[in-house]
Amino acid sequence: KQKTAYEIRLSLVGSEMCIRDRIYTTAGSRRAVVSLDAKTGEILWTHSIDEGERGQYAPRQLSGRGLAHWESDSTGEEQIIYVTPGYRMMALDAVTGNPVASFGDNGIVDLKQDADQQIDLITGEIGLHSTPIVAKDVVIVGAAHRTGGNPKSRENVKGYVRGFNVHTGERLWIFHTIPLPGEYGNESWLNESSAYTGNTGVWAQISVDLDLETVYLPVEAATGDYYGAYRPGDNLFSESLVAVDLNTGERKWHYQLVHHGIWDHDIPCAPILADVVIDGQLRKIVAQPTKQAFLYVFDRVSGEPIWPIEERGVELGDVPGEWYSPTQPHPTKPPPYDRQGVSEEDLINFTPELRAKGIEVASWHKMGPIFTPPVVSSIDGPLGTLMAPATGGGTNWPGGAYDPENNMVYVVSNSSVTSLAVVPPYPGQSDMAYIQGSALSGPRTSGGAGSVSYTHLTLPTKRIV
């Protein structure tokens, strides 16, 4: 029987990383970096900084989800790179834990600066809780914001993506997830709404194909999550998978998975890169799990869908001032790996009494297929739109993985239902006409609370619990 060699107790721990005989992780409310001896568990060094008010205003606090490692091919120099809660990128010597003096300002790059926008260094609501990614000599950093259902303002910080030199911390490139005037995609923001709209960060993990020198960016929704009247248009590159050049940040291709999102369908996890034989041909693919339980699969060189993605008509809502897209993308393969939308047939049916109660509760709400829009909540009904998967997915940041031996993609999915509605804000709460209303969750449905799903890339989707 295998015995436990040692146990280390750390509070608020991020994902651990083992490099040879050392373990690195983040821990604690200040996101300290900790280095451990992998054999004994001895703490070799720790590093943290006190960010004062800036850390207190940070939208993504605590330990975060981990850190990155870089090693020089020529000198063997090793660095640990991470982003603090206050949105500073730090490079530490992997052996000593000391800041790397040649990187930025004595080991620190202030990510609130040189960002092609004005960001208040103390109160600017932008940060990152996922890890930066190092590819060759480029460090790529995304951005995260506060949860966007109840924004204080229609104006917010933009979540641009940047690449930095791993040796010096110099900014190499920036990709504007909300295009500037004259850039591709700016025309998808009507009424000059690109000027003040924010968010569209990449808070999920980023993937890189080193051979193709291509970075795959899973982009979140724009301000606000459920009410988009102040940003009419399709809103590129919100809720899009974007491929950019590793060395320059220039867009190679993109595919928008949700037009003018009003459902908080951020792309929540790392794109999955795989080389797969499809119809007798070896294809380099990128597969993107989503909150809406669709697996979108593309040729990762060209961006062309491996199987057709149809633009299907969806219901247009009646929230005052809202702009609606008449269609939304629906993959034809693979099939959805979790429940989409809610109908009376989905309600709980363990006993006749529970079934009747489920129908009664559901009658207070609007029901329909995926992409049924939110409503203005009313005490006279409907209270909200029953949404499945809920705003947390489907799939969320744990994402999925590819098994090359069995040609399977495995994803974790949450089968929960939520009631989605908007309401006028309280005086002084927001300058938006409507924000998210969250009085109650949706009714229980049959089929359980979640599943692990697997998709054979040439066969139907299956679910395993």
What are these regions (language model features)?
Residues Q2-G14, I19, H456, K462-V465:
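Single conserved hydrophobic/aromatic residue that forms the stacking wall/gate
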Residues S15-E16, R20-A32, P59-R88, G124-P151, ...:
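Repeat-blade elements of multi-bladed beta-propeller folds
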Residues K3, E7, K158, P268:
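Short coil/loop residues immediately preceding or within conserved phosphate-binding loops
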Residues P334-S416:
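Long, low-complexity segments enriched in small/aliphatic residues
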Residues R20, T25-T26, G392-L420, S430-L457:
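C-terminal substrate/ligand-recognition segments
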Residues V33-Y57, S74, M89-T123, R154, ...:
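Extracytoplasmic/lumenal domain signature
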